[in-house]
Amino acid sequence: MSQHLPLVAAQPGIWMAEKLSDLPSAWSVAHYVELTGEVDAPLLARAVVAGLAQADTLRMRFTEDNGEVWQWVDDAQTFELPEIIDLRTNIDPHGTARALMQADLQQDLRVDSGKPLVFHQLIQVADNRWYWYQRYHHLLVDGFSFPAITRQIANIYCALLRGEPTPASPFTPFADVVEEYQQYRESEAWQRDAAFWAEQRRQLPPPASLSPAPLPGRSASADILRLKLEFTDGEFRQLATQLSGVQRTDLALALAALWLGRLCNRMDYAAGFIFMRRLGSAALTATGPVLNVLPLGIHIAAQETLPQLATRLAAQLKKMRRHQRYDAEQIVRDSGRAAGEEPLFGPVLNIKVFDYQLDIPGVQAQTHPLATGPVNDLELALFPDEHGDLSIEILANKQRYDEPTLIQHAERLKMLIAQFAADPALLCGDVDIMLPGEYAQLAQINATQIEIPETTLSALVAEQAAKTPDAPALADARYQFSYREMREQVVALANLLRERGVKPGDSVAVALPRSVFLTLALHAIVEAGAAWLPLDTGYPDDRLKMMLEDARPSLLITTDDQLPRFADVPDLTRLCYNAPLTPQGSAPLQLSQPHHTAYIIFTSGSTGRPKGVMVGQTAIVNRLLWMQNHYPLTGEDVVAQKTPCSFDVSVWEFFWPFIAGAKLVMAEPEAHRDPLAMQQFFAEYGVTTTHFVPSMLAAFVASLTPQTARQNCSTLKQVFCSGEALPADLCREWQQLTGAPLHNLYGPTEAAVDVSWYPAFGEELAEVRGSSVPIGYPVWNTGLRILDAMMHPVPPGVAGGLYFTRIQLAQGYLGRPDLTASRFIADPFAPGERMYRTGDVARWLDNGAVE
């Protein structure tokens, strides 16, 4: 028996990956060679047997003993002549041949399956056309040695045709590779390589992917999409000629790296690069799997040219080649993590300069890859040819990509090459990756211009009250008011505020528990021409004091029991308000103006000191008029006020019903945290319209049974969610339980509540493929932009930074002009306009919605 050898180079990773996977044939590699011409099939079959016998790794056996895996060459193993199959009389010879190959590949072909790890077949599909099918286990060969074996078999066939002796084996015994590898592991070179890769790992940027799905640490799929791109129109050749000082391989790599970076919207990312790991060693002519995929940190500068990027990447690879023997799995282990635990890189790049040509007299040979092993994400094989053209083969994990998306990405690469061919001095940051028609598509999505009246919240409410004075308007557990009665209370309180010194343009703080008096106070403040500043009484005293110090309101409305909390705030007029006032008429004061600030709401402070966001009257008027148009309320509707007033969602609860003749009912303080209390509240008041933060909707759904959903939620006609990502499965559960339409809204505090919408029920919900419902489409007079790091629009499917524009922008941050200038920036696509940088990452979906 031959010497027992340990697994080396790529073998341990392949062995472990197969053991951990439930995929039966993922680690098989296969291709077929299409032979056109006169072929002596029996002679070729003899050449196959002779050629296979010359590669000792093809006779390897494997065993595992006490956790250690060993391999040895089975000297007694012989190879049978490959089967010769004649399909010339078949209706579809090509399809039948491909089906035979796929059937072979779909078997359990794991190393311990008992099936042959080496398999050849000769299939005749026409008089002078053959398919030579070849399949190996990846433990035996790699992408370098596979075509080398095919080439040697072709050489043997040609020798047999000429009546010459079988050519000697060009292949090194794999035992030499193992010995050399073990010597390397004990050498100073290994220590130097370890130090080099430790430093590279520290500097390595995070991996990127063209897929929106999270990048897995280890692939769970061998289902691969293949796309072959042929750049034979001369544009790559033209570019290479213009940049004669740059190697074509370096140019191809730079184009691929830039294309990936721009489509990932990542100027710094980690890709994989395939190294032969054969230079100057026994492995140079061995057939075992020694290829190494190592992490390549790609850094793209917007202001550099393509030649500069190509030269820099080439220098980087030159340095890496000196250390290419070090295992990628060892790099991960050196960083304290298990191989496969998390991805080291995303897409894999491979410059293929292997000789795939077979020199058989009178026969044309073309190789067609069938299986190359699992693809974690995306692999790009770059083939610069001797004519100066370029072809690229894209392999994509089918669980992460679909063919139309890949084809679209490929079109962008062609467009990128064309731009550089037209202008080789073009900067990397100035390349356009938008396809023709996509600018018009985005313009159509943002065509939201609607003329709205130049008015204010108080004017809209007064107008509605005049139409329906006797309709029920506002209620809580103790009080209820008609529209006329509500207006009388609002005007009375507004006049009282004016007597206490409140002037138009001022701000008034409100620290009231949830009740009718909270709603009346907010309406009175805008009636007086001022802006309201909500203070959540559940906040700590220090936070409330900080908000008052920053906002410096002219007055505080609170209750007797809350008053002591504000005793040490200087220069603050206080008004205790917890009972109806004597009516003084309901005529509008008409003090509020469209340019006034409507409200000031402080951010959560999760990213530092809370900031007061000022939102203008015109912005919130647009938002409410859009909502009434899109989700119309009538006099039959009952809206729940359950959102804490410190969150801007409460704004539409406090005002929307009163521009539509609907009724607002106030939940008890803290009831919004109690799902059972909310069930009772909905049932008692016949609530038709309400809002949930998704996490609270989940708690509410968990409290429901089919029976209680029928009893307590039957009046609900429309339910809104915002504030967090809305899980699609939660929407499906809600739909099944209640049937009430659910709507997803999105908007930061720096907007007038929400800037986008998406149905989270029915057909739209059924079409959601991600884990969360999209944030959707822009509301009236609002634009959504998704931009890359260079402030260029990104195409559909590409992630970028989310911005919004136009009428619903907040006025800015209270007393923070520096911060306002950094977040509310000039809109480069609309001179004189501003846009807000949300900090969220988003992408356009094919239906025009934002996700």
List PLM regions with ranges.
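His-Asp-centered acyl/peptidyl-transfer active-site segments
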Residues: Q3, S21-S28, D56-T57, S113, ...
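Non-catalytic, low-complexity flexible loops and terminal extensions
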Residues: A10, I153-I224, G297, C428-V431
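Conserved AMP-binding/adenylation subdomain of ANL enzymes
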Residues: K611-A640, D648-T688
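Gly/Ser/Thr-rich phosphate-binding loop
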Residues: I659-A662, V687-H691, V701-G770, P774, ...
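A short, small/polar-residue-rich loop/turn motif at beta-strand boundaries
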Residues: M1-Q3, G37-A53, W72-G114, A194, ...
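Carrier-protein-dependent adenylate-forming modules in NRPS/ANL systems
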Residues: M1-F171, L263, L294-P295, Q324, ...
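Flexible, P/S/T/G-rich "lid" or insertion loops adjacent to the active sites of thioester-utilizing
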Residues: A17-A26, W190-V246, G336, M434-Y439, ...
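AMP-dependent adenylate-forming
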Residues: D327, E341, N350, L358, ...
